[in-house]
Amino acid sequence: MSLSVTRENFDEWMVPVYIPAPFIPVRGEGSRLWDQQGKEYIDFAGGIAVNALGHAHPALREALNEQANRFWHTGNGYTNEPALRLAKKLIDATFAERVFFCNSGAEANEAALKLARKYAHDRVGNHKSGIVAFKNAFHGRTLFTVSAGGQPTYSQDFAPLPPDIRHAAYNDLNSASALIDDNTCAVIVEPVQGEGGVIPATKAFLQGLRELCDRHQALLIFDEVQTGVGRTGELYAYMHYGVTPDILTTAKALGGGFPIGAMLTTQDYASVMTPGTHGTTYGGNPLATAVAGKVLDIINTPEMQNGVRQRHDAFIERLNTLNVRFGMFSEIRGLGLLLGCVLQTKFAGKAKLIAQEAAKAGVMVLIAGGDVVRFAPALNVSDEEIATGLDRFALACERLQAGGASCG
């Protein structure tokens, strides 16, 4: 018989690095979840932009079960068919010629930064080690990636941090230009800053970074962990901007809920990563790559990408209507189905409170800092689910505006 558990057990048994919601989801289908008490929620959080096809998608369940009935894991001393097939699909769909599989976005970014440093050291010299990143970015929680992230809140307790990482202002080409020089080995940037407030880059900014990297022989890394796999209405956001990076990192939606990450690059850059220079025990395991292959088959279609753009318009229209009613947001921004509602000054710092009230009303949303409510729903969310979820979100806004919301 299974052990009966409650939310209170989290506080008793788990390392307290999270403060989970007061309810425990136990079942999901599409864009709906149900908790232990049977309450239904519309899911606009998507596991933080992970559940690109919603919960328990039948094609993903079939792919997982089919591979689970064969074998689960062999380690990196062997390759496997699902990993090779997924690598070829990613290569055919993008600029890439080589793929490295891992288990998360942080691992993918770690691999990208290590590759950039090694390439510069091998081809130029050890002095070419500088990394330019951006303030309020998020690239993961390893010591290297959290240092690149440019949010002291996440890194200040773990000094000394890796050296030679400097941070420019996002969407400010002059700020970046002042830091990028011949000793720079890489520039890492999110096409849309997700955790930093759902801020899309301007095309001129990314084009300018491309030109600066070319001028100084630095590698341009696009962190597409949150924007990738259809989230923005293109398979990857670099396609939306028409700016091609040297390295692209992807994770989250790639597995549709099954942990996987990948670093994509060209043959020339990949060639410096010789046997033993990097690795991972679980990366590219057949369960993850079988599921991810099916995710890519479904999402990498004109129908799906057109659908994301249409759903973007539906969200924006309804959010604008809601904002006319409540006047809570100073800006509604984002690309595709990665959207952020910036709170007016009078509601500053209350994004988490709105998210808590939304959950009480039966809709799950995210935050991106204290002042931005973030939406990252499934790419196949239905019109009815959008309408129902935003009606529930309106109840949370109404409660907050009336002053009846409280933390907890």
From Swiss-Prot:
CDD domains from the xrefs?
A: OAT_like
Q: Which domain of life is it from?
A: Bacteria
The alphabetized UniProt keywords are:
Aminotransferase, Arginine metabolism, Pyridoxal phosphate, Transferase
* Record-linked InterPro entries: Ac/SucOrn_transaminase_bac, AcOrn/SuccOrn_fam, Aminotrans_3, Aminotrans_3_PPA_site, Class-III_PLP-dep_AT, PyrdxlP-dep_Trfase, PyrdxlP-dep_Trfase_major, PyrdxlP-dep_Trfase_small
Q: What is its EC number?
A: 2.6.1.81
Q: Which residues carry this modification: N6-(pyridoxal phosphate)lysine?
A: 252
Associated pathway = Amino-acid degradation; L-arginine degradation via AST pathway; L-glutamate and succinate from L-arginine: step 3/5
Which co-factors does it depend on? pyridoxal 5'-phosphate
> What chemistry does it catalyse, as a reaction equation?
N(2)-succinyl-L-ornithine + 2-oxoglutarate = N-succinyl-L-glutamate 5-semialdehyde + L-glutamate
Per UniProt, the enzyme's principal EC class comes to transferase
Stored SUPFAM superfamilies: PLP-dependent transferases
According to the UniProt entry, its GO molecular function terms are: identical protein binding; pyridoxal phosphate binding; succinylornithine transaminase activity
Gene Ontology annotations of biological process type: alpha-amino acid biosynthetic process; arginine catabolic process to glutamate; arginine catabolic process to succinate; ornithine catabolic process
Task: Write out the function statement from the record.
Answer: Catalyzes the transamination of N(2)-succinylornithine and alpha-ketoglutarate into N(2)-succinylglutamate semialdehyde and glutamate. Can also act as an acetylornithine aminotransferase.
Q: Which PANTHER family match?
A: AMINOTRANSFERASE CLASS III, SUCCINYLORNITHINE TRANSAMINASE
UniProt lists the family membership as follows:
Belongs to the class-III pyridoxal-phosphate-dependent aminotransferase family. AstC subfamily.
Q: What name does the UniProt record give this protein?
A: Succinylornithine transaminase
What organism is recorded for this protein?
Salmonella agona (strain SL483)
